[in-house]
Amino acid sequence: MSSLLIEGGRPLSGRLNVEGNKNAALPLLAACLLTSEECVLENMPRIGDVAVMANLLREVGAEVDGVGTTTVRVRCRTITSSEPPAALVGKLRGSVLLLGPLLARTGRAILGMPGGDFPARRTIGTHVDALVALGARVLPSNGHALDTPDGMKAASFYLDEASVTGTETALLAAALIDGVTEIRHAATEPHVVEVCTFLQRMGVEVQGAGSSTLRVHGRKNLKGATHRLNGDYIEAGSWAVVAAVTGGEIEVRGARAEDVEGIAFVLKRMSVECTFEDGFLGIQKS
């Protein structure tokens, strides 16, 4: 589709439920590679990016069931390849999240240039620097190739930017390292907190979730886990804003109150009648 034709002038009204947060879905799928046991992810968004990530997991040895539904099951008994197909990697920016799990389980990761956003605008230097701090070595490559000739070791380091996927890459790599890894200048977004929660269910101790300093007590063997994704607060907020600017009334369910509070605060400051509580965001005519 090259263009969208939008006929405005009508209030947007109604009720809807948001699905799980896409920005949490991709790192959670990558985290499933950290264990040989089955992981179950519920309330998954039914979007193309999830299907692409599922195919990437299959290419490195995982069994993935339920794609296209809201419950996805992943089991990766053995990593069969440390180099997912470059063509598939090129379809998804989130493919960079495979670096940490592949290095942690196999000591090697080769990744073509991640797709999605224009590379000049978003690099993965922060991700690579974090992995190097944990013991990885950068190899000559047209994309990104790393190995760990002396193994991975716990470390304390400062991220040069509070990158979400950079923080998640560091978390996923540190999860399988014995000892305590300290990540400073970490991203604090709700989906980063959700990754911390999932890792804790797998047996990792994570301190400081939601703050800019994370302490990860890793372990060599992680267990499988079940996790229900939080609702996508960005989608919820988008619907709320559209309803507000068109003079409509809408009820959006599925997002947590603490995740939509900032959106509600701004709307109220603009004199929009807005109510929010856990699992509910409402916009009234104003």
Where are these regions (language model features)?
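Short, structured segments at the rim of ligand-binding sites
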Residues: 1-286
